[in-house]
Amino acid sequence: MRTRFLATDYFAPSSSSAAGKALALEFFSFPSLPVPALPPDPHFLPFTSADELPAATVADDGLGPLPIASALSDFLAAVIPQALPVPTVPAADEVLDDFLYDRGGYGEDFSSWEFGAFRIPKASEGYGVINREKDEKGEGSRSDGLEISSVMKRWEQLKELRFEVVEVDLLMALQEDIASFGEEESGGGVTLLLRVPDMKIHLDFIDIETDIKIRYQSDLPESVYQVEKVPVKDNDGNGHSSLREDCCLEIAALDHGAVIPRLEVSRNSWELDDCLTETDRYGVFDNVVRHLDEAQIQHSVFKSTEFLRSTDMDMLTFVCEDAPCHDIQVDKPAEIKAAVEMDVVRINGNILLEKNSALYPLKPDGTCSDLPCSILLEEVQIIDFPSDNVFKMLVQSETNKMNISDEIFKDDFDPARRLYESMVSCELALVDDTFRSLPTPILNDDIAVRSRVPPIQEILCSLKPHPLSASDGIYLDWHLLLEGPCNREICCSYASMVEEAKTCHLSSELQRSCQSTSVFVSDFLEDFQRSPKLQDEDKHSDIYVPAPLSHDPQKLEATQKCEQEGGTRNHSSMKRPSPEKSSSFPELISHSGDLNFYLNVRSATKSGTNNENTSTLDVPHSEEQALSLSTRAKVDKLIEIHPVSPSNLIQGLIEQIHASYTSALQESTYWRHSFSDEQGLGISKQKLLELITGEGSEGSYNHCEHKDKMELIVLYALKQVAYYLCFFGLHAAHLYISNLTRSLENTPERLKHILWSISEAQRKSERQLFESHPSLSCIETILRSNKQIDQKILIVADRAFWLPLGQKLASMRMTFVEFGQNPATTFVDLVNKTNSTAWVLEELLKSDCILLDNKNIPASFPFDKFGIILEYGGPNKSSTLLSLAPKLDGLPPLHFLYVKVDGKDFPAALVEDNHKDQDLKSTLDKVLLTLQKDLQERMNKMRIVDSLNFIPATNQLQGLQEKRSKHFAADATKELLPDDQPHRLQNLNKKNTFDSHNVVLADEQLHIQQTLSNKPVVNSQCVPTVEKSSSTSSVSANVLKDPQENQSTTDLPSCVKNDCIMPGRLSVPDVVIVVNTGNHGKTMLVSRRSSYQQILALEKGGMQVVERDIDLPVDLILSAAVCLVWYETALFEANELTTSAETSGIKENVENIATNILMSVSFSFTGCIMVFEGEADFLSAVMDSSDSLYTAAASLDMNLQLFFSHTPRSTDEIILNCITNVTSCYKAPLPDIPESESLAESFLTSFPSINPVSAYMLLSSGGSLVEFLSWPHERRIQAVGKYLLSPKIISLFNALCKFGELGESRSVMTECSSVDSDISSAFLQSPRKRKQRSLQACAVPTNKLLFSDSLNQIPGDYAEHAEVFSPSKLRKFSDMDNTIPELPDVFTFDESLNMRSEGFSYQQKKHDVDAIPGNQVINDDFSNGLTPNNQAYNRRTGNMVDTFDLPWQPEFGGTHPSKSTFHTSRPSCSRTHSNPVFSTAFEINDDPGEWNISGGTKQTWKGLAHGGTVDDSYRYDMDNRYHEPRDEIMQHPASSLAFQKLDFGSHATSQGSCWEIDYLRQMSAKRKARQERSRCSNSPGMSIPRMRDSNSKILNPPPKESFRYRGDRDTPSRDQSPSIGTQHYGKGKEGAKAQNRRARKDFNVQPTSHKKRIEPSIDPTWTPIDKRARQKLSFVTYGKEKQSKLVWRNQNSPGVGCGFRKRFREEGT
């Protein structure tokens, strides 16, 4: 690989021939020059010293004759090396110079790692070789005696010449005894001076153990001759270098400053030494500071590229094609400030400076470089391979491109060493990381490597199989596990095998081992129906596995005694083993003897005993057991015990309560005087109650003040809430602590924290994230296993557990009834309940299970009528039914559950103690006696004690309401059971007569309660409900047909009833009012202090008032669908334009409200209440312009109601009445709305269809916001169904999320797009098709009267012509569904923006109309609340006040129905299909319990206000039930149109009412009249077949004339201005004939012709000429505007009547 120079030094003789060459030189004949003597030098190479030779000189004054001797002297001085003397050890500060002596002193192109610079003196300077030593004191004299001045003189005259780096045969040099040199001269490296003057070579070593790699710089020239330097380890203590190997010690002894290239691999490790000594550290910094500012860099006269003159190619690109380009950084000395901040680091004796994990080198002159060192510390693993394998793998490697013959590797190691030396030679251009890892590569030979599979196979083959046991033959066939899911046939076959196995006889020892026998179960059959054969054999089962009574020592002893003294059983004769054999028997039971080991396939193998989870009890039923246990008869029942441990959540809450309890004990001064911590924790609640009341304190009551009693109350409350939380779950605990905090005037902080924690957990439980109590999961498993075989179930539990238990039963769709809640079954004597059996038998026909109180078990209860009994003991570890076993006959199989509180870290003392409910009466009496203050204080005291003793139970009605709301929300389309019918609750608004803090006991003790409190018992007709703060979702599923059976007194205190809520104590409010604090160009209601203070006062009644800055111009948000806007005269005066008439400005403002404000409000609300306040002239002008408001509201599909007021006081009354009526109607559960706006609310309210109330409905729908956005449209509607949120809001929200903003569909108001952005939109169709459809849409006229009448009839051909109502046709125009959804709610129509459904479907609900309570037509509470001035103005405006279905009352005996504030009514233009809208005026003036508001999909709100359900299965058989109308009905215009737009689903009332009969007759008359007019109005001019076949109807926004002032009521009415409506076109032959079989008195029938179509009037009204409209209200766009606006246009203007709204235009099919 050598290309230019050989590494052989011909002038350096070897040790063997040194003497011979010395003699050879003696025979050289040099003229006039003696041969110098060359004695061997023991310290270095044996050459003659150059100082002994005469120096050659050259004259400076011209060239003279040169003798030959002078030339030979110069030649010899130039080519013959000479020995140099050994210098002395340098000073300590020379360490820096020796370590970095070769950096920065050889020119600008030389880096800090450059080696091999040669300095050749001139001929006149002699043959001296100058050392780099800088000792100016003259230490270490030279062998020739030269002075330091001459040496420095020659040094300055040196000339730098650059040659090839000379290789030296180090083996010869290492064999000699080399003296040691100074420890810090060469910086840890080894230097060697050759004969060549001033040439120094560094000996560096590559440490294989630590993988010290050669560092290659980025530039190509430097990479040719640079070799990384590895310094030798240096220690501080001994003052000299310490190396590991002897050869390295010899090399380190060379103290000549020469640098030797790296030629061989050594195994020296590079390790980090300890820190420098104080002396060395001080010397380093002193040298740095002195030389830092004086540093200078010497530059070379030659460029480094001179070494590459022999090559013409770029070796960097030759080795690596994609070599990175690095900029060469100029080495500059660092500033002294930066150097002082650095840390001194010593690595193997080398001193470096560290800053920010970077090492900076020190230069020889003491300066510090600003370029960090490239030192790589890396550990690699070196694996020694045999030489033959190494090179064999190297040759066979695919990456090896070298063709090396086998002759090179004939020797063992030498050839490999030569190859490696050639690879690491400095002549190789290592410019990148190609050769960075120099250790021998590990190349695996895939052919030679042995596979791991054969050894594993050999090991497996060598294993011996386990010997077969005798039990292998009884294993079942396990192939069913390999077939995937088991089918029913296979499992039934194995069930038969199990049945056959039951006939085996067990030994007496197995039967006697009570505590250690596993239960015989077959878990792999638990998911399948039990076979009839198995069920039949269960009734005659002869297998009895007796066990002691659970955890009761007395019962256990009695059972054992009975076993020893009892006679033989009928089915077998058992021997009684000794106790020793019984105790040792469990240890002898193996897996082979356990049948569960073989049969339990699906639930994994269970072995040993399992008496903690399930035990079997065989309890006698003979009456003689109470007297004597000598004999007992066979009992045919199996008892299983299921211990339940508290969940982690409950344990965490109890630990929190325990921590609060402990801290209260430590902070209480009273307890420090009375009890220790342990005594305070173990004190019973009865003792705490005595200390609170002051009775039985025995002297400790003397220093118990009011503050101490409050601490006692907190301690008692903590113990009680922990008790309910542990044994009855989150619901009971939440009810208890909520009731207690409302009873206290100042709630302690400890109770607030506990209340907040339990409330958070309870809300999560309502979302079904986890169970409120862990026993509910076990109960569900037991009930589902028995529900499949259709068995009646009896559940015995404490009343406090009925609430979560009822929720679980309701979620399982199981009906149940609570025993003892019916007044007919309430008796004082619990034993003599003679009618309990009959009542149970009657209820079992309608219910799946019965709930029974474990404290109230009658002796005559028919237990044998149930297939299974489930008893929840809670804190009781023994069964209550088993204690009554002698009195119970035929007890069916029993499942007993109890809570197991045994645990090391569980505070059992905090939850186990509980006072008896029987002591409640005596405690209340003692409270009144111990308190000696005034009556008010005694009452407060009694309330506190009552709250402390509050039992969190529920009643039947609460369960019924919550179950219904959740059931309809979860599955609105599921058909209810026939027995699941609601019942009318007629007196729900009556006030309860209980004291707000009285405690209600069990209904069997109501007479005692009445005696104590001297207060009447609640009437059975009035069923109090639990307040909403209980936060229960679904409880009871039982349904009773008799209203008397569904109403009873309850054991709840009346403090939790709706009518007796304490002010400001409602944790979850029933009503939320949102007040707008924004500024929208008008005076906001919040700015009027008097009005806003009255709204804030509503919080005392349980309402919540929340302030929000809303972008909409509304003042109040009463619900998710209704808002209230208030205007005063000042607004209109400020905004009045400069006109001559004052009213013109008011009209313009009213039109602005109609076109802009109503438009923006219509996206978020379906109902709006406007209150105008001002003087009479102002109100008159607003009334005259109110037609535009009604027309705009009807066009926008909104319900609008106007109120007018003179004074602020009357305005406040109107607003408060509106709040009361709206909130009383909206009885859906409300979400928890915080006081401050959240980020999610801000995001949702940015959508135009979402307001703050509906935003939190979406957020409380059961998932996070991200999950809600990922749900489909149907899932979203179903999720918010329980809140009765309008599906229109969700549909618009989905449309905005789906389509975004596209093209001309962008709205300038909402910055969102409409449904026209869809790809199927008509706007995206071709102009020709769009124009054709537009002409078709405008060409079909409409008949308003025809459609108004059609609302009162169900077409009989819906099923035959279902294709008429295709989705594409339903979406054409805004008012298309006026003909469809306003049909009776017997039919419901699903309609949304998502048109994936095909066709038009309707569904008939199967409910009874009797379930809906009767309507009270007029309620004067709201109307009488208005001032007389308001009534006068309302009478003046008549039907202009409301677009709702205004109150109407038919004639009864000729009397005029004028009790309402509004005397007339007009048709409402709102659509009342399945979307919930704001109640009509008819409903708002009706009884709150009878309001009719659409409530979600396929239901209305009728009856939901007080727990009733929607039942709209009214059968409208028009042809059979309708009769001819009376003529007098048609005389009054108001009566003719009173029910024209009413929601039929809301009028399914009791049969036989007078107004209903008149109503049905009127509908029949309208139906027949419409049929006649339909035949007369058919236009024969419409001859296009496609148009004639089309059954689509197009509705324009209602005309303004329908809202005009009617004038005097007695004036004969006749409509003079026909309006454009919708007309039916028929195909019959009589289509062109005018048939007027029943002409109405107030309607003129005009004959039709082919040339002109006669438009019938909307209704028989008469409009004064001065009040008739000369313009029409339509939607238009101006210029480039993309948002249409509602403006008045002339009737003759083009396009009037065809300006349909953009969002309802026809989309392409």
From Swiss-Prot:
Whether Nucleus counts among this entry's keywords is yes
The biological processes this protein is annotated with in GO are:
reciprocal meiotic recombination; resolution of meiotic recombination intermediates
- Swiss-Prot/TrEMBL keywords: Cell membrane, Chromosome, Cytoplasm, DNA recombination, Meiosis, Membrane, Nucleus
> Segment Disordered: which positions?
532-586, 1566-1662
Effect of disrupting the coding gene: Complete sterility of male and female gametophytes due to altered meiosis. Striking reduction in the number of meiotic crossovers.
UniProt lists compositionally biased (Basic and acidic residues) regions at: 532-542, 552-568, 1601-1613
Where does the protein end up?
Answer: Chromosome; Nucleus; Cytoplasm; Cell membrane
Show the coiled coil region(s): none
Superkingdom of origin organism: Eukaryota
Quote the InterPro entries the UniProt record gives: SHOC1-like
Might you report a single GO cellular component term? nucleus
Tissues/organs with expression: Highly expressed in anthers and pistil during meiosis. Expressed in pollen mother cells (PMCs) during meiosis. Expressed at low levels in roots, shoots, leaves, flowers, and glumes.
> Where mainly found?
nucleus
- Briefly state the protein's biological role: Essential for normal crossover (CO) formation during meiosis. Essential component for the formation of class I meiotic COs. Interacts with PTD, another meiotic component, to regulate CO formation, possibly by stabilizing the recombination intermediates during meiosis. SHOC1 and PTD may form transient heterotrimeric or heterotetrameric complexes with HEI10 and/or ZIP4 to promote class I COs formation. Does not seem to be involved in early meiotic recombination steps involving double-strand break (DSB) formation, processing, and single-strand invasion.
How does it associate, per the subunit comment? Answer: Interacts (via C-terminus) with PTD. Interacts with ZIP4.
The UniProt family comment states: Belongs to the XPF family.
Q: What is the protein's name according to its record? A: Protein SHORTAGE IN CHIASMATA 1 homolog
Query: Which species does this protein come from?
Result: Oryza sativa subsp. japonica
Q: What is the lineage of its organism?
A: Eukaryota, Viridiplantae, Streptophyta, Embryophyta, Tracheophyta
Query: What is the primary gene name for this protein?
Result: SHOC1
